[in-house]
């Protein structure tokens, strides 16, 4: 089957909203919305392998560090894993006083009751209830008329109000979502929400949240903005309602729809870091926040070390962030075009400290989000970079990780500029050897002994430091963590890759490590050995020696 010659026979365009006096096009975003992360709920449920409790806790703490004050942590009635995670957050006292957790429930009595059980003892909590309202869902999925949908919503609202009153020790907030809002008749969306408002009776001092999801993005962003502005004009008790946006990225315009929705009067945004979520993902909170930042409006979220945040997200979600992803991708601050590089270099030369940022091709100063300028200002050839990677893989079986490709290409580029000649595969490998494999000073790994028991690794190392013999010992959850613990300097592993070189009895292991010493930019190391543990240790020493050597050279 192929694309239809006349798609109008199968698909119908979305109907425009009749709003001739719309005001949002002339507005700008001047206030920061209430942010709510749905990484641990909407994001987690979309993963091939959902997070376990340890990963969820690590992610939760990262969200708190970033500055999120509302965090949707679970769907506690859906699984024991989610229920127990909520209990651990509360009983373990992991929730800061200025953070409110949010949980999701369907509009069913047993699920709502179970949800309140999970929240017992919480200081503050948002109970988020939803039911689908769109015509296709009413007709195809639930076989309900409009009144049936209203009854589901109001019955759930009544039960939530009753159960909340039975647990007065918690400061409750209520949230209702007419699921598939963006595909629901606007008049009916308001009818359902007004019915819920009538049950909950919010006030300006005790507001409720009405979350208006583009559960499936089905129109251009301006249509969503029209829907939000129309809704805001017609909903009851607008001064007692927080209008929340929850967009998805099915058409690739989730960020734009959210920004226009804020211009249309919304107060709050739900989304995920780097846009994880069902199908094409939820709106990316990082992109939204940094878009505001680059317009001079601080988002009240801290991405000063964006690579550290990305590391947590990638490891917990087990999904890589695309190298072209806005602000955080490996390549977003790198220009491969010579004319772009020339403009950037001239921009840096004229950019004065504390002046308005005007460097061409760079919408944000990489330093503001913890990035250095090495990848930005280097002289780089796209064909050279691709050729380096290809030759090393084909001739030597070495497959450099992406960030290491970028780092090593600078070494090769410097040599080609010096020589003014094309480099052969052998010359490139010699550069790799000298830069990484022969980085054996000031620390030389003489020997190591590894003991592993009950998930704990202990490593003893004999090391030569500038000719002086030393003994190091470290303990950790794995060999590398134990080795890092043994180091005489504070270091953090940012990335690790390994693969086999060759096959059979002559196979060797190649390990690549990216580390960051305190106060320095990340650097890579390579180790090759018949034993993978030894290879990884050699890689770490390679990176360590390079970092120490560069720090000494910089200080000299």
Curated annotation (Swiss-Prot):
| Major subcellular site | cytoplasm
Protein EC: 2.3.3.13
What Gene Ontology molecular function terms does this protein carry?
2-isopropylmalate synthase activity; acetyl-CoA C-acetyltransferase activity; magnesium ion binding
- Return the Gene3D superfamilies for the record: 3.30.160.270, Aldolase class I
Q: Where does Mg(2+) bind?
A: 42, 246, 248, 282
**SMART domains from the UniProt entry:** LeuA_dimer
* Positions of region (Regulatory domain): 439-556
Q: What pathway does the annotation place this protein in?
A: Amino-acid biosynthesis; L-leucine biosynthesis; L-leucine from 3-methyl-2-oxobutanoate: step 1/4
CC annotations in GO = cytoplasm
Cofactor annotation: Mg(2+)
Keywords assigned by UniProt, alphabetized: Amino-acid biosynthesis, Branched-chain amino acid biosynthesis, Cytoplasm, Leucine biosynthesis, Magnesium, Metal-binding, Transferase
Please list the residue ranges annotated as the Pyruvate carboxyltransferase domain: 33-307
Query: Where in the cell?
Result: Cytoplasm
One Gene Ontology BP term is: L-leucine biosynthetic process
Task: Name the chemical reaction catalysed here.
Answer: 3-methyl-2-oxobutanoate + acetyl-CoA + H2O = (2S)-2-isopropylmalate + CoA + H(+)
CDD domains assigned: DRE_TIM_LeuA (cd07942)
Name the family. Belongs to the alpha-IPM synthase/homocitrate synthase family. LeuA type 2 subfamily.
Q: How does it assemble?
A: Homodimer.
Which PANTHER family has this protein been placed in? 2-ISOPROPYLMALATE SYNTHASE (PTHR46911:SF1), PTHR46911
| Record's function text | Catalyzes the condensation of the acetyl group of acetyl-CoA with 3-methyl-2-oxobutanoate (2-ketoisovalerate) to form 3-carboxy-3-hydroxy-4-methylpentanoate (2-isopropylmalate).
Task: Please identify the protein, giving its name as recorded.
Answer: 2-isopropylmalate synthase
- Read off the lineage from the record: Bacteria, Pseudomonadati, Pseudomonadota, Gammaproteobacteria, Pseudomonadales
């Amino acid at each position: 089957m192929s694309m239809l010659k006349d798609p109008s026979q199968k698909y119908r365009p979305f109907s425009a909203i009749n709003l001739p006096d719309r005001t949002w096009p002339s507005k700008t975003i001047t206030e920061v919305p209430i942010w709510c992360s749905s990484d641990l709920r909407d994001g987690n449920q979309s993963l091939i392998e959902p997070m376990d409790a340890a990963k969820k806790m690590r992610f939760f703490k990262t969200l708190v560090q970033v500055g999120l004050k509302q965090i949707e942590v679970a769907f506690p009635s859906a699984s024991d894993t989610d229920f127990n995670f909520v209990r651990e957050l509360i009983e373990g006292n992991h929730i800061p006083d200025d953070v409110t957790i949010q949980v999701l429930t369907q509009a069913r009595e047993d699920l709502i009751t179970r949800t309140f059980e999970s929240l017992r003892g919480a200081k503050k909590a948002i109970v988020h209830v939803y039911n689908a309202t769109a015509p296709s869902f009413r007709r195809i999925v639930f076989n309900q008329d409009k009144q049936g949908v209203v009854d589901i919503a109001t019955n759930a609202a009544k039960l939530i109000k009753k159960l909340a009153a039975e647990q007065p020790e918690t400061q409750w907030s209520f949230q209702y979502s007419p699921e598939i809002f963006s595909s629901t008749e606007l008049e009916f969306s308001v009818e359902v929400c007004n019915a819920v408002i009538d049950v909950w009776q919010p006030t300006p001092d005790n507001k409720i949240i009405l979350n208006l999801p583009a559960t499936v993005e089905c129109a251009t962003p301006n249509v969503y903005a029209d829907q939000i502005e129309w809704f805001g004009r017609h909903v009851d008790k607008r001064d007692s309602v927080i209008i929340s946006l929850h967009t998805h990225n099915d058409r690739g315009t989730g960020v734009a729809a959210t920004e226009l929705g804020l211009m249309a009067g919304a107060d709050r945004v739900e989304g995920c870091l780097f846009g994880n979520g069902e199908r094409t993902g939820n709106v990316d909170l990082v992109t939204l926040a940094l878009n505001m930042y680059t317009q001079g409006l601080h988002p009240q979220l801290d991405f000063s070390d964006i690579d550290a945040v990305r590391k947590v997200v990638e490891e917990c979600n087990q999904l890589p962030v695309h190298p072209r992803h806005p602000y955080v991708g490996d390549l977003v601050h790198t220009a491969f075009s010579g004319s772009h590089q020339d403009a950037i270099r001239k921009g840096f030369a004229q950019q004065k400290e504390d002046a308005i940022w005007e460097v061409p091709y760079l919408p944000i100063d990489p330093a503001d989000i913890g990035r250095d300028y090495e990848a930005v200002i280097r002289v780089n050839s796209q064909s050279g970079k691709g050729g380096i990677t290809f030759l090393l893989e084909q001739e030597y079986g070495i497959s450099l990780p992406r960030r290491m490709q970028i780092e090593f290409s600078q070494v090769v580029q410097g040599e080609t500029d010096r020589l003014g000649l094309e480099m052969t595969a052998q010359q490139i490998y010699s550069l790799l050897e000298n830069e990484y494999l022969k980085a054996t000073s000031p620390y030389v790994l003489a020997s190591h002994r590894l003991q592993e028991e009950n998930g704990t690794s202990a490593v003893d190392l004999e090391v030569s430091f500038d000719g002086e013999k030393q003994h190091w010992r470290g303990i950790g959850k794995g060999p590398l963590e134990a080795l890092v613990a043994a180091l005489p300097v504070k270091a953090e592993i940012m990335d690790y890759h390994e693969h086999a070189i060759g096959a059979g009895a002559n196979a060797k292991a190649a390990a690549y490590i990216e580390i960051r010493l305190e106060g320095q930019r990340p650097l890579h190391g390579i180790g090759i050995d018949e034993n993978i543990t030894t290879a990884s240790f050699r890689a770490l020493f390679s990176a360590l020696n390079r970092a120490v050597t560069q720090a000494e050279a910089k200080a000299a």
